[in-house]
Amino acid sequence: MGVALRDILADYKTPVTWEGLSGVAAVDANNTLYQFLTIIRQPDGTPLMDAKGRVTSHLSGILFRMVNFLEKGIKPVFVFDGKPPELKQETNAERKKLRDEAGEKYKEAVERGDEEEAYRQARSATRVDETIIATSKELLDLLGIPYVQAPSEGEAQAAFMVQRGDARFAVSQDYDTLLFGAPLLMRNLTVSGKRKIRGRAVTVNPERLVLSEVLSGLSLTREQLVEVGILVGTDFNPGAAGVGAKTALKIVKSGGFAQKLAEKCPGFDPAPVADFFLKPPVTTEYELAWGHPCVEGIKKMLCDGYDFAPERVDAALERYSAKAGQKTLESFF
């Protein structure tokens, strides 16, 4: 997912504490749900499920991360992907193929008792489907957390909302949020402080990326940063073979973008991709209103509907009350 710019952005990542993260956060919903589905799993790689075999990893992730966000003074608004652009069709088709292949490899690993391989392939087979989206929105409604339906890419809409001042920062693991123009991007906002990287749990800290600092430090315009992304490869184009982020940066700064692209990707027109990053489809048709969480509704959905342990749900809801110094979750608002 996203664009591989890590190698040129390392110097511009600033560790931050949770205490400095208050304000409205435009959360890249699909990216966040994908994290929940890949990380919150059982030892054999299968996601958390209820007695009916329905996946619940994302619901657990939403509940506990949102509790944590609100405890820290973060007011989240989830931004869901809309219709994918035609530019993304090839990428989506390739991802589906890889997920299907991983699903078959998972079954083979289970049959031969290879738990480690089964876990790895199960994560690779993860998909955010319509049921995951619908149940996530249902829980967000009950929690009183607003969400926005983007016309296209959620990262683009989140970036736009920060540009407008409707959110303080965007939350996503994807660096293309910067290419879409997010002034402030936050990464690694996990409850546990850990992420799975190459199958291992590693400790991570919240980190901040400020677009103006990135552009100033790299001596680039945003248009040039997009060119770097196009050379490396994005969700909308495969990139130039053998060109990594550092090489792409040198090429763009030396004025060789068009020549290198013509050499490596003959016949490819970068203009539609650049235009999509610089002028993506976004909407102003949204309302940000945080409502009163429905305690009984949350319990009914999670405990009665999806077999969540009542004590876990109660403990999460009590954290709201402890934070507010009051007896009920509703009174927190």
Swiss-Prot record:
Positions of the UniProt region annotated as Interaction with PCNA: 325-333
Enzyme class: hydrolase
Entry's cofactor comment: Binds 2 magnesium ions per subunit. They probably participate in the reaction catalyzed by the enzyme. May bind an additional third magnesium ion after substrate binding.
Region (N-domain): 1-99
GO terms assigned for molecular function: 5'-3' exonuclease activity; 5'-flap endonuclease activity; DNA binding; magnesium ion binding
Cofactor section: Mg(2+)
Binding site for Mg(2+) 1: 28, 81, 153, 155
Entry-linked Pfam families: XPG_I (PF00867), XPG_N (PF00752)
Matching InterPro entries: 5-3_exonuclease_C_sf, Flap_endonuc, Flap_endonuc_arc, HhH2, PIN-like_dom_sf, XPG-I_dom, XPG/Rad2, XPG_CS
Chain positions recorded as Mg(2+) 2 binding sites: 174, 176, 235
Region named I-domain: 117-256
Assigned keywords, A-Z: DNA damage, DNA repair, DNA replication, Endonuclease, Exonuclease, Hydrolase, Magnesium, Metal-binding, Nuclease
Documented EC number(s): 3.1.-.-
Presence of the UniProt keyword Zinc-finger in the record: no
Gene Ontology biological process terms from the UniProt entry: DNA repair; DNA replication, removal of RNA primer
Role: Structure-specific nuclease with 5'-flap endonuclease and 5'-3' exonuclease activities involved in DNA replication and repair. During DNA replication, cleaves the 5'-overhanging flap structure that is generated by displacement synthesis when DNA polymerase encounters the 5'-end of a downstream Okazaki fragment. Binds the unpaired 3'-DNA end and kinks the DNA to facilitate 5' cleavage specificity. Cleaves one nucleotide into the double-stranded DNA from the junction in flap DNA, leaving a nick for ligation. Also involved in the base excision repair (BER) pathway.
Family: Belongs to the XPG/RAD2 endonuclease family. FEN1 subfamily.
Subunit structure: Interacts with PCNA. PCNA stimulates the nuclease activity without altering cleavage specificity.
Protein name: Flap endonuclease 1
Lineage: Archaea, Methanobacteriati, Methanobacteriota, Stenosarchaea group, Methanomicrobia
